[in-house]
Amino acid sequence: MIPICPVVSFTYVPSRLGEDAKMATGNYFGFTHSGAAAAAAAAQYSQQPASGVAYSHPTTVASYTVHQAPVAAHTVTAAYAPAAATVAVARPAPVAVAAAATAAAYGGYPTAHTATDYGYTQRQQEAPPPPPPATTQNYQDSYSYVRSTAPAVAYDSKQYYQQPTATAAAVAAAAQPQPSVAETYYQTAPKAGYSQGATQYTQAQQTRQVTAIKPATPSPATTTFSIYPVSSTVQPVAAAATVVPSYTQSATYSTTAVTYSGTSYSGYEAAVYSAASSYYQQQQQQQKQAAAAAAAAAATAAWTGTTFTKKAPFQNKQLKPKQPPKPPQIHYCDVCKISCAGPQTYKEHLEGQKHKKKEAALKASQNTSSSNSSTRGTQNQLRCELCDVSCTGADAYAAHIRGAKHQKVVKLHTKLGKPIPSTEPNVVSQATSSTAVSASKPTASPSSIAANNCTVNTSSVATSSMKGLTTTGNSSLNSTSNTKVSAVPTNMAAKKTSTPKINFVGGNKLQSTGNKAEDIKGTECVKSTPVTSAVQIPEVKQDTVSEPVTPASLAALQSDVQPVGHDYVEEVRNDEGKVIRFHCKLCECSFNDPNAKEMHLKGRRHRLQYKKKVNPDLQVEVKPSIRARKIQEEKMRKQMQKEEYWRRREEEERWRMEMRRYEEDMYWRRMEEEQHHWDDRRRMPDGGYPHGPPGPLGLLGVRPGMPPQPQGPAPLRRPDSSDDRYVMTKHATIYPTEEELQAVQKIVSITERALKLVSDSLSEHEKNKNKEGDDKKEGGKDRALKGVLRVGVLAKGLLLRGDRNVNLVLLCSEKPSKTLLSRIAENLPKQLAVISPEKYDIKCAVSEAAIILNSCVEPKMQVTITLTSPIIREENMREGDVTSGMVKDPPDVLDRQKCLDALAALRHAKWFQARANGLQSCVIIIRILRDLCQRVPTWSDFPSWAMELLVEKAISSASSPQSPGDALRRVFECISSGIILKGSPGLLDPCEKDPFDTLATMTDQQREDITSSAQFALRLLAFRQIHKVLGMDPLPQMSQRFNIHNNRKRRRDSDGVDGFEAEGKKDKKDYDNF
């Protein structure tokens, strides 16, 4: 049989019926019927007039819409009409009509075979049934074929299968008006079928009687089912009549009609009387269209030329009872609050992205609410318990209650019989918390379905493969079933019954026609699968504390925002003067909902427009948009990147300083270890070198005029104890203190960050200027300030103790001018105040093309920021007339030479970091010579860049790494050889493309004085007077280790005083020069 589903309209086209029959013969729809059941079904389908379906002609497609009654709008309980060969059960009038209409709806299915017609011989027709009572209602059906009084008897050997979804006709029949509740409806007994190629349909309107037939022996394929009363939330049923089956044990057919007795169904009266007027009009229209339909069907029959033959039913054959179809399978998802048509759809829904997102959001909200009860947005909100949403105000809550989404959920819950919470708003004062219960993943396997079925029939708890499913009804849902389970013998053969996955019980009492079979099935389930019947269901416990809404609380929620701008919302009327929509002139928007007018006036968009165009003093809450939020996040990300960059830079500087100290510590440790070794070697009689100690090497590694000594095994590096100790001790005294290094690092980093902000400010100003004016040019130019770089001793790491001046170079995209310099000097104090609370003194030195920044706290540091641009050097390197390029220069351009010097300082710093920083002892010797240039006036004229080049060349040209003492000696040897004198090769600048001597600024006298001083310092080094060169006191001598090999005749010079007095007063005078 066909279950009732809330489908409202469908259309059948005869040209497609063959394909449906093919699917039916292939067992496409999954129903199992025996052959006798199929024949009984065919007999029933052929004789009952279809009052709910209009079959169309092959050339014309006709359809209609069945309107359901408001009372039974959500009824999903199936009602079945048994076939002529099954047990006749008394039923209410609307249910019987539904069954008759359902059976008639499938009476016109052709068979799948088109070549063979299975005909049977004529048999004597049985005695006609008695005439119907006077109250029998005759239906005038609007069929599109000609009726005939001679039913055909042609049977198909194939079985008929029905699809449980196409049941709109049954719902339509249930809504037909009925003159009386206790009226008797009859069902005809003769069987009829249709031949394969027939297109002419004949069917006589016969009276119907319900005949009680002796039930046949139950077959294993027989399906017993339960008929549940229908419930409605609009008007509940007062009392449900008990369905009492009537059985007669006789060998012949009985025509005794079985009728209903008892109270009337008040739940159906609204549907019956509301559809009376529409049904009467339909009957009048059907009578008018009958003549035209009959003529069209007659023409079709004449064209086909086929007739139907009637075959009398078998008098002596006992028919097997026919299986009714399965009840409807309803799949409901409590997370998404939707229902699915079948298990495949429900499975796909569970695997879909929408369900997973909602489930993840639900879990996240539960975890968040359980961990933090004061989450954002949970205070002062109106909550809808049915939809599980929160509204920020009373207007939004009212709009949600009227909305389509809420109504859809209400309709679905009403149809499923689920409890519907009250629509009264509740103020949420705490977030929801959940108690997660472990649950198995929903599946649709047959084993789980069987287990679920057992649970439904035996335990009065509707558990299934779906989550959160509950049933409504009386507490005595299936109370008698449990007692019957234990009373049934265990050795009885269990019958295979088909039960729905989920039966929603909406009435007061559960009634069934197959209690015995169901009890046996329940016993089998309890015996075989007692464990699988228990399905874990996840429970979500709502810990939300909802307070009853009082008028005061609603007023408090609504008083936060007052509507503004009533005068700017005008009513738009049509020609009849009816208001069709509202138009807001401020927001330039229209809406047709009168309830939305007040909400629009309170909305943030309208208030922002009102503030912008009418009242700037209106207070509007700050709620950044997605774009503004993204911009803010981008700014924060950039700020974090800046902070990370400066932090890494400071760490690199700190690491560099630590590595320098580590190198010094390693040197001292290695020197002390080797000191003991060489002291012992020096006291050995034959120790040392086999050919005597090697003499000092020349500049190129070989003494001039002497053959190279034979090379033996590579000796260990011989440290000069006194020279290295003195050099490193001097270096430790001239190295900056920790306070000075931190002060330099602080002021330099603050200055660099402030200049970056100044660059951003100037760039924004230029953009605004271009937007206000004509932005056809200047649109694609770079920012005015491109970057700031460290130069000089700061970049090279040559700071000495007491140095307070460092240099920075600010690169510009254009040639720097006095105007740009003044603008930077004006903006720099503002940006410095943003970065650091300390005070700084800023001076603008136009002659130096620089800005001088002085700190006001100890130790006072000075930063010189020189402006330059690479364009100046590019123009200077061009061939031809330079004045042609200078015509474009601004009138207040800064000093060209100062800018070129700043560019040269950039190249020098880059070269030094690449060549000299990694050279052993190079940085230490340059610091020693810088201190020498500051102490001795003769050396003050030596250019620092030339000295750096000379030291790097002298140390890098050595055959092996040099210790600090050897490196200093080697540098003095180079200068003493006359490399800086006039006529010598000189020192070419590696950072210039054209040959350029770095000593060009020195006079001849200065060159000779420095060369002479270097020669005298070399003599002092030879006589162990390096402390005089370095300007420091002699270090205490290390303790002597006396041994038997010490056969020195002269006394060791260990008194710590100068041993150079015996040389005469000449050496004393030369020492005074240092």
Curated annotation (Swiss-Prot):
SUPFAM superfamilies: beta-beta-alpha zinc fingers. Residues 120-139, 349-377, 421-447, 702-723, 761-781, 1040-1074 are annotated as: Disordered. GO terms for molecular function: DNA binding; double-stranded RNA binding; RNA binding; single-stranded RNA binding; zinc ion binding. Expressed in lung, liver, lymphocytes, heart, pancreas, placenta, brain and kidney. It comes from the Eukaryota. Residues 365-377, 427-447 have a biased composition (Low complexity). One of its GO terms (cellular component) is cytoplasm. There is a cross-link at residues 509, 541, 623 (Glycyl lysine isopeptide (Lys-Gly) (interchain with G-Cter in SUMO2)). Coiled coil: none annotated. InterPro entries: DZF_dom, DZF_dom_C, DZF_dom_N, Matrin/U1-like-C_Znf_C2H2, NT_sf, Znf_C2H2_sf, Znf_C2H2_type. Residues 703-1073 form the DZF domain. Keywords: Acetylation, Chromosome, Cytoplasm, Developmental protein, DNA-binding, Isopeptide bond, Nucleus, Phosphoprotein, Repeat, RNA-binding, Ubl conjugation. The keyword Lyase does not apply. Gene3D superfamilies: 1.10.1410.40, Beta Polymerase, domain 2, Classic Zinc Finger. The keyword Ubl conjugation applies. Residues 762-781, 1062-1074 have a biased composition (Basic and acidic residues). The modification Phosphoserine is found at residue 1054. It is found in: Nucleus; Cytoplasm; Cytoplasmic granule; Chromosome. The modification N6-acetyllysine is found at residues 509, 516. Found in a cytoplasmic RNP complex with STAU2. Interacts with STAU2. Does not interact with STAU1. Involved in postimplantation and gastrulation stages of development. Involved in the nucleocytoplasmic shuttling of STAU2. Binds to DNA and RNA. PANTHER family: ZINC FINGER RNA-BINDING PROTEIN (PTHR45762:SF21). This is Zinc finger RNA-binding protein.
